[in-house]
Amino acid sequence: MQIGIDVGATKIESVVLDEKGNESNRERTDCPKDYFQIVKTIKEIDKKLEKKFNKELPIGVCHPGVHSPQTGLVKNAPNCYWLEKKPFQNDLRKELGKEVFCENDANCFALSEALDGSGKHYKIVYGIIIGSCLLYTSPSPRDS
């Protein structure tokens, strides 16, 4: 069994998968806007799930942005500004007291689709995650 955690701008979602990849548990909570509260929330989720399943579980965390190989700091996480320039993976490892694997959320999405999703029968899989918004500012419809 293993824990997967998806950290986003507004939520933290956790899932526990069994050895065959079947979902055993799924939970969602609001994402705090404070960096240390997020680390604490992930620790609480981890401990709660380990207690529920009565064993230590490996954990992987996906989030916007990437870890700089030179510094270990997160960069390019515009929707999760609280992650910018923070040693997220190292802080999680220290707080949880075990190995924590962190990866960019788009990379995790593409890997999941390639391994057991819609791309599992293909040699090459291209994953796209787009957060987008269209703004109409001149003249504003609200000004009408």
Question: Could you tell me what each predicted segment is?
Answer:
Residues 2-40, 74:
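Short glycine-rich, Thr/Ser-proximal phosphate-binding strand/loop in the N-terminal lobe
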Residues 1, 13, 63, 126, ...:
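Conserved beta-strand and immediately adjacent loop positions that scaffold enzyme active sites
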Residues 64-67, 131-133:
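Short glycine-rich anion-binding loops that position phosphate/pyrophosphate groups of nucleotides
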Residues 19, 70, 142:
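Short, ordered coil/turn segments that flank beta-strands lining enzyme active or ligand-binding pockets
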